[in-house]
């Protein structure tokens, strides 16, 4: 199993690479790519960690060597948020980066599963889909927007509030990966109940958690370490499913039946070919139903922005 990380010299990429080097199954290959010249050195640094995961690093404009034979490609390349920016302010720079890298994936490893981490995910996934479609290699079961950070944050905040072990809590999060489009389904957390005020406050905190980190880092960056952990969790789940493990479920932002929007984050059963089944979002509370209806315009606009970027 070969996993490629594109954007591997950045804050998210390095954290992700470290976690994959220590947690990928024995015999896996990990390839790191970034435009930055330090990237081969990041791979050498990680190669000293005693795990049976082969690692190589590549830098420069061309990601081909890193992508050859990749089964999973995780893309975290791009610029990070600064205070006062929201994820959509990143669009102007990151859209071009994602387009370029996905073109290279389409050419070199068209059958790979692709996880897009680069923000704004609501839009960059649409860009990736259109690029793959133009290349004639788009498979909607193999393209994912990685929203796992919203899930791990939800799990953490709910566990803190309710005095639970974080590992015991699993909150499904649907919609998108920015602001109001992030919708934690708190009504579906087993064995935990919330007041209306708690639901409103928690939902808002989960939606704004990225900003919480950006502000706390005082201009020095955005959520890189927790995002690295979230991306590793998703990537490792995907690897387990591709290797035949049954019953692997993760939420991610994928193209579905278009019931809510062309792309939508929902629980997915993963399998040997990527998405095996898009699971139902279940019964929503009145608060959640209202929030879902209220976000769709924003989500659809985000998606259209990505489609237009490629097709203009």
UniProtKB/Swiss-Prot annotation:
Binding, substrate: 81, 87, 119, 153
EC number: 1.1.1.37
Any Pfam family matching the protein: Ldh_1_N
Domain of life: Bacteria
A single GO cellular-component term on record: cytoplasm
MF (Gene Ontology): L-malate dehydrogenase (NAD+) activity
Catalytic activity: (S)-malate + NAD(+) = oxaloacetate + NADH + H(+)
Binding site for NAD(+): 7-13, 34, 94, 117-119, 227
Enzyme class: oxidoreductase
Keyword Oxidoreductase: yes
Keyword Magnesium applies: no
GO biological process: malate metabolic process; tricarboxylic acid cycle
Keywords in alphabetical order: NAD, Oxidoreductase, Tricarboxylic acid cycle
Catalytic residue positions: 177
Role this protein plays: Catalyzes the reversible oxidation of malate to oxaloacetate.
Subunit structure: Homodimer.
Protein family: Belongs to the LDH/MDH superfamily. MDH type 1 family.
Name this polypeptide is given: Malate dehydrogenase
Organism: Escherichia coli (strain ATCC 8739 / DSM 1576 / NBRC 3972 / NCIMB 8545 / WDCM 00012 / Crooks)
Gene: mdh
């Amino acid at each position: 199993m070969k996993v490629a990380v594109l954007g591997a010299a950045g804050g998210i990429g390095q954290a992700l690479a470290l976690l994959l080097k220590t947690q990928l199954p024995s015999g896996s290959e990990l390839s790191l790519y970034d435009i930055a010249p330090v990237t081969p050195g990041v791979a050498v640094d990680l190669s000293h960690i005693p795990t049976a995961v082969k690692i190589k690093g590549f830098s420069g404009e061309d990601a081909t060597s890193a992508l050859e034979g990749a089964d999973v490609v995780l893309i975290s390349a791009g610029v990070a948020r600064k205070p006062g920016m929201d994820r959509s302010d990143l669009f102007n720079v990151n859209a071009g980066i994602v387009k370029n890298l996905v073109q290279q994936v389409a050419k070199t490893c068209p059958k790979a599963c692709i996880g897009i981490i680069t923000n704004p995910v609501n839009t960059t996934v649409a860009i990736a889909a259109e690029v793959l479609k133009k290349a004639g290699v788009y498979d909607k079961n193999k393209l994912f927007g990685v929203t796992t950070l919203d899930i791990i944050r939800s799990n953490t905040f709910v566990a803190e509030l309710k005095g639970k072990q974080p590992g015991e809590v699993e909150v499904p999060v649907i919609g998108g990966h920015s602001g109001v489009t992030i919708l934690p389904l708190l009504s579906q957390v087993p064995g935990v109940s919330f007041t209306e005020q708690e639901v409103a406050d928690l939902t808002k905190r989960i939606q704004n958690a990225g900003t919480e980190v950006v502000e706390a880092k005082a201009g020095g960056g955005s959520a890189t370490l927790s995002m690295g952990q979230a991306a590793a969790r998703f990537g490792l789940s995907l690897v387990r499913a591709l290797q035949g493990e049954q019953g692997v479920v993760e939420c991610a932002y994928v193209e579905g039946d278009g019931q809510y929007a062309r792309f939508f984050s929902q629980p997915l059963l993963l399998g040997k070919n990527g998405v095996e089944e898009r699971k139902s979002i279940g019964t929503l509370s009145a608060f959640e139903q209202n929030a879902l209806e209220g976000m769709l315009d924003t989500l659809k606009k985000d998606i259209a922005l990505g489609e237009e970027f490629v097709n203009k």
